[in-house]
């Protein structure tokens, strides 16, 4: 009888411990996600701000003709040069693809590697990538994507030169730009590696980057967390196919 009582007590104690563990896990998980969401909302805002500042200088901005042809746009704000030198991830950013009537929720990516000879001495640099066709975008949705590998990459033209825009379109699937110390220009980023930050994508959306940016995934703005909407909304102000 006593052994039975002891056994029951042990079972009850174990059940109590498991209940407490589950309670703490239930509380900790939403808190962790809220922190991630806040960080990604800030990242989306920085990307949107950088893009806005670039486009607000028409004579030195991305040509409208190219912007309107882009299938997806990536912005990596405030990338630290030192991160590339030591081989670590240089920075984080967001990618949205064009969808009917606007742009998709931003998926989160890392950027690193490559040759950045023109940026020696720069503390922080904003990078903008235009994916000019679905083939280039599909390459991005792999686990790791190297610019200049399967998809050709070229320094994008700036300003109002339509002729330059047309010529570049014939040569590259991806156009790359950089802004450092207020100077915005095309920069060829061959060898740069971009990979999805799926820990953050899952924390914010519950799915990975390739699902977020899939052409078959139907999103509405109401399904997108409010904090990260600023990036697709900013892109829509400058380019929306009607």
Give residue ranges: language-model regions.
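Bacterial N-terminal signal peptides
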Residues: 15-23
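Residue-level detector of alpha-helix boundary/anchor positions
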Residues: 1-4, 68
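Sec/Tat signal peptide C-region and signal peptidase I cleavage site
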Residues: 26-30
């Amino acid at each position: 009888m006593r052994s039975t009582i002891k056994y029951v007590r042990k079972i009850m104690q174990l059940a109590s411990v498991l209940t407490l563990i589950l309670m703490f896990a239930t509380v900790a998980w939403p808190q962790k996600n809220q922190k991630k969401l806040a960080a990604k909302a800030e990242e989306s805002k920085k990307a949107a701000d950088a893009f806005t500042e670039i486009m607000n200088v028409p004579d030195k901005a991305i040509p409208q003709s190219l912007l309107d042809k882009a299938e997806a746009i990536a912005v990596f704000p405030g990338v630290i040069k030192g991160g590339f030198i030591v081989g670590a991830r240089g920075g984080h950013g967001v990618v949205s693809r064009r969808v009917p009537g606007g742009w998709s929720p931003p998926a989160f990516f890392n950027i690193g590697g490559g040759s950045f000879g023109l940026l020696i001495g720069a503390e922080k640099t904003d990078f903008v990538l235009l994916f000019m066709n679905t083939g280039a975008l599909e390459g991005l949705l792999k686990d790791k994507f190297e610019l200049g590998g399967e998809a050709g990459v070229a320094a994008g033209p700036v300003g109002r030169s339509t002729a330059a825009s047309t010529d570049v379109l014939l040569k590259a699937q991806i156009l790359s730009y950089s802004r450092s110390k207020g100077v915005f220009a095309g920069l060829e980023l061959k060898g740069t590696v971009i990979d999805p930050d799926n820990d953050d994508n899952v924390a914010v959306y519950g799915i990975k980057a390739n699902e977020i940016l899939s052409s078959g995934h139907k999103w509405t703005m109401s399904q997108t967390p409010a904090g990260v909407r600023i990036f697709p909304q900013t892109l829509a102000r400058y380019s929306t196919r009607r």
